[in-house]
């Protein structure tokens, strides 16, 4: 069945499984982050468990032990996740794309409220699955913009969304060919 593991580099050209109790997923993704700004890396996992249940779960790193944090994110498979501080408030927010248990495509943005909680913001991103999301300051204005690719209801798409601040993103209609 599907697995999710972390291997620690023991500095002797060997990697050792730390035996963290993460749910195994396929058709998904795992990403490092430091959402709580405590200097250690936390983990988010999204995908299909062996039972077929779709999950998106965040795990806080507490001195090398990973504890599930029940935030209530939308559960997605065929997903991608990109962390970035889109609102320039000093903490990591994230964009996520994928497909729900019911087959609905999603593209969501979660704002880190700096208190261990996240709120969903509602920019008009095209819903996709089986794609990629990434942040970068393409217009050099000091805030990060979003690149989003994947399979939409109308076929493959690639979009660039300019961050206009205050949770507003504008599709710049870039000449990007769908993948």
Question: Which residues are covered by each model-predicted region?
Answer:
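Hydrophobic beta-strand segments that make up the repeating blades of beta-propeller
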Residues: 1, 43-48, 94-99, 146-151
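Short polar/acidic secondary-structure junctions
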Residues: 35, 48-50, 86, 99-101, ...
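Blade-edge motifs of beta-propeller repeat domains
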Residues: 7-25, 60-76, 111-128, 162-179
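Acidic carboxylate motifs that coordinate Ca2+ or other divalent cations, activating on Asp/Glu
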Residues: 38, 42, 89, 93, ...
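Beta-rich catalytic cores
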Residues: 2, 26, 54, 77, ...
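A generic structured-segment signal
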Residues: 27-29, 45-46, 55, 78-80, ...
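A short loop-to-beta-strand structural motif that recurs across blades of beta-propeller domains
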Residues: 3-7, 55-59, 106-110, 157-161
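Beta-propeller blade termini
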Residues: 28-35, 79-86, 123, 131-140
């Amino acid at each position: 069945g599907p697995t999710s593991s972390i291997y620690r580099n023991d500095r002797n050209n060997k990697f050792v499984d730390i035996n963290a109790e993460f749910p195994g997923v396929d058709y998904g993704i795992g990403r490092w982050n430091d959402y709580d700004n405590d200097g250690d890396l936390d983990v988010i996992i999204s995908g299909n468990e062996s039972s077929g249940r779709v999950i998106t779960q965040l795990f806080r790193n507490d001195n090398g032990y990973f504890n599930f944090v029940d935030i209530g994110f939308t559960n997605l498979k065929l997903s991608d996740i990109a962390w970035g501080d889109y609102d320039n408030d000093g903490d990591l927010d994230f964009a996520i794309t994928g497909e729900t248990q019911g087959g609905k495509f999603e593209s969501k943005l979660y704002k880190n409220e700096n208190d261990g909680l996240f709120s969903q913001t509602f920019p008009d991103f095209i819903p996709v699955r089986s794609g990629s999301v990434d942040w970068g300051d393409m217009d050099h204005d000091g805030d990060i913009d979003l690149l989003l690719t994947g399979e939409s209801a109308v076929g493959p798409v690639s979009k660039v969304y300019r961050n206009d601040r205050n949770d507003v993103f504008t599709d710049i209609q870039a000449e990007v060919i769908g993948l």
